[in-house]
């Protein structure tokens, strides 16, 4: 599939890009004369957790441990699950997220938007 965009009057030919292609391409910000930080909040999932989840899935695929259509189950209370659901959606995996029932509605909605099935548990379950 070929997509054309126009920037400043010029056509830009795009290859099909994946969300995970943008993980890790985060800027350095200067904190002081000798200190810099990576701005991980610029990752597509909004957190540093995008990096390890991408690496884990890349490694599992490379070693033929998972393939599209498989189901991945993760116990999480937040950013790892969001990153997993986001990347799994683009790669064709099903995701089940086990999370505390008291997590924010925003997180639950975001996970569902990426197609994750939520399994909510109460404290002590």
How would you name each of these model-derived features?
Residues 1-125:
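PLP-dependent amino-acid enzyme catalytic core
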């Amino acid at each position: 599939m070929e997509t054309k965009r126009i920037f400043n009057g010029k056509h830009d030919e795009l290859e099909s890009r994946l969300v995970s292609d943008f993980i890790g391409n985060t800027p350095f910000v200067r904190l002081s004369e000798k200190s810099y930080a990576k701005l991980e909040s610029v990752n597509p999932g909004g957190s540093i957790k995008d990096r390890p989840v991408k690496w884990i899935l890349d490694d599992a695929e490379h070693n033929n441990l998972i393939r599209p259509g498989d189901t991945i189950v993760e116990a999480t209370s937040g950013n790892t699950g969001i990153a997993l659901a986001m990347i799994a959606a683009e790669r064709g995996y099903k995701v089940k997220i086990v999370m505390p029932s008291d997590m924010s509605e925003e997180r639950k909605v975001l996970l569902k938007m990426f197609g994750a099935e939520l399994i909510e548990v109460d404290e002590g379950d």
